[in-house]
Amino acid sequence: RGCAISMPFKEACIPLVDELDASAQAIHSVNTIVNTNGHLKAYNTDYIAIARLLANYKVSPDLVFALRGSGGMAKAVACALKDAGFTRGYIVAIDEASGKQLAELYGYEWRPDTDGIEADLLINATPIGMAGGNDADKLSYSEQEVDKASVIFDVVALPPVTPLIRYARERGKTVITGSEVFAIQAVEQFVLYTGIRPDDVLFQKAAAWSRL
């Protein structure tokens, strides 16, 4: 019926589909493909999950944020931040072209690194900390940067507790995990695949598991 797309293929898969839903077209990033009689239509349910989590955790849009990454997931995060009312923030990306493009699209500032940035909300939208990767054991932000922040958001879903999340919890920070993103967006994927929306009890069980 379809498939899910994860980092780093959220943009690379776009030429392979027949149609982009409005969400995927606006963000230019895909995480869900639905096959209807051979017609491949792409969607982005990451945005829904990120926006909902920002609201659920009551993350104030007055906070200054740093968003590390400029790929497909970072695009969904940046769009959700803008729609939630965040006006001050930095897109931190090694790739100058994609970093500047994303920052300018939403009215934020691009930086190649975090030097000199003081942010209250730190978001990782890169594979740093992802299981099986070259940077699986690394922090996507320094300990000093985490110490100064109040909210830490890591979109990496595996492992459920990344090095960044582990350190942030040890420091008593508010943390939002990639597992939570995965659980919420997976419900939206399920709806797209089946036309059926799971009841709230089932979702709460899945969300509770994602926070373990």
Briefly describe each language-model feature range.
Residues 84-106:
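NAD(P)-binding Rossmann-fold cofactor-contacting core
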Residues 106-175:
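Rossmann-like adenosine-cofactor binding region
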Residues 1-57:
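Phosphate/diphosphate ligand-binding glycine-rich loop within oxidoreductases
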